[in-house]
From Swiss-Prot:
It comes from the Archaea. Transmembrane segments: none annotated. The keyword Repeat does not apply. Belongs to the KAE1 / TsaD family. Its EC number is 2.3.1.234. It comes from Pyrococcus horikoshii (strain ATCC 700860 / DSM 12428 / JCM 9974 / NBRC 100139 / OT-3). Keywords: Acyltransferase, Cytoplasm, Iron, Metal-binding, Transferase, tRNA processing. This is tRNA N6-adenosine threonylcarbamoyltransferase. Gene3D superfamilies: 3.30.420.40.
Length: 324
């Protein structure tokens, strides 16, 4: 059984084709801007322009045609409204033209679900990206959000700070390299509130200290990462303690950061739980995770009538009943 998935919640358009155990194609194109940030209209235009060539590329890579696809899945939300609507329109058009069932997928859930292709059973997930920062796990038939950012996503915080330092966009990899040269920890605000996190105070103070000219930029980069990542690891560990689950996964674009991986791995080893990070192309926003989650949903008897394929910009993770 094969599923085609279309991802387009933000600045990346991704199209993936998967079977139950294998990724046959996973292609994407990311809108980049000189100043950074994403304008929803520009993202929508980017997705509309590249939808057809990317679909062709995915089918060619998988060595199949649309006739071979069993179900079409698309990212229903959360995300940027105009971008989501382009994706949903394309998915509906394909479903109608080729007479295929269609499934809307929650983007955040898909990030965790794709780890199950690699034998992960029931993890606590730390999902870290530009716009999202969540600790989630399956409890009572739904993905419960145990902790999340109260203001900005960790990826956005990193990008804004990197931009302030003149590193350009995306800033994550460049900030990480700079942080590796840092030697002295500089005190920065650490904000964990219950199980939730806040990064705005950390970002504001890091920028203030940088502008003061009194601190080495390498030390500031190092301290920024250490402070933010320690908070992420703390709330993830609390969720593990609460749920008593034996697996923890790291997903989302910021999962590329080696220091965050290292800190989570140490915590997991201390607790005696399995730690897993998918290959990076399945960590970042991608169509394969949408296809895989959609396939699992479809196999459990879920498909959407067209009138239920409306996009949800603020699609909460715990809205979805997990029956697959």
């Amino acid at each position: 059984m094969l599923a085609l998935g279309i991802e387009g919640t933000a600045h990346t358009l991704g199209i993936g084709i998967v079977s139950e155990k294998k990724v046959l194609a996973n292609v994407f194109d990311t809108l980049t801007t000189e100043k950074g940030g994403i304008h929803p209209k520009e993202a929508a235009e980017h997705h509309a322009r590249l939808m057809k060539p990317l679909l062709k590329k995915a089918l060619e890579k998988a060595g199949i045609s649309m006739d071979d696809i069993d179900v079409i899945a698309f990212s229903q939300g959360p995300g940027l409204g105009p971008a989501l609507r382009v994706v949903a329109t394309a998915a509906r058009a394909l479903a109608i033209r080729y007479n295929k069932p269609i499934v809307g997928v929650n983007h955040c859930i898909a990030h965790v679900e794709i780890t199950k292709m690699f034998g992960i059973k029931d993890p606590v997930g730390l999902y870290v990206s530009g716009g999202n920062t969540q600790v989630l796990a399956l409890e009572g038939g739904r993905y419960r959000v145990f902790g999340e950012t109260l203001d900005i996503g960790i990826g956005n915080a990193i990008d804004v700070f990197a931009r302030e330092l003149g590193l350009g966009f995306p800033g994550g990899p460049k900030l990480e390299k700079l942080a590796e040269k840092g030697k002295n920890y500089i005190d920065l605000p650490y904000a964990v509130k219950g199980m939730d996190l806040s990064f705005s105070g950390l970002l504001t103070e890091a920028i203030r200290k940088y502008r003061s000219g009194k601190f080495r930029v390498e030390d500031l980069a190092y301290s920024f990462q250490e402070t933010a990542f320690a908070a992420l690891v703390e709330v993830t560990e609390r969720a593990l303690a609460h749920t008593e689950k034996k697996e923890v996964v790291l997903v989302g674009g910021v999962a590329a950061n080696n220091r965050l991986r290292e800190m989570l791995k140490i915590m997991a080893e201390d607790r005696g739980v399995k730690f897993f990070v998918p290959p990076y192309d399945l960590c970042r926003d991608n169509g394969a995770m949408i296809a895989y989650t959609g396939l699992r949903m479809y196999k459990a008897g879920i498909s959407f009538p067209l009138e239920k394929t409306i996009v949800k910009q603020k699609f909460r993770t715990d809205e979805v009943e997990i029956t697959w």
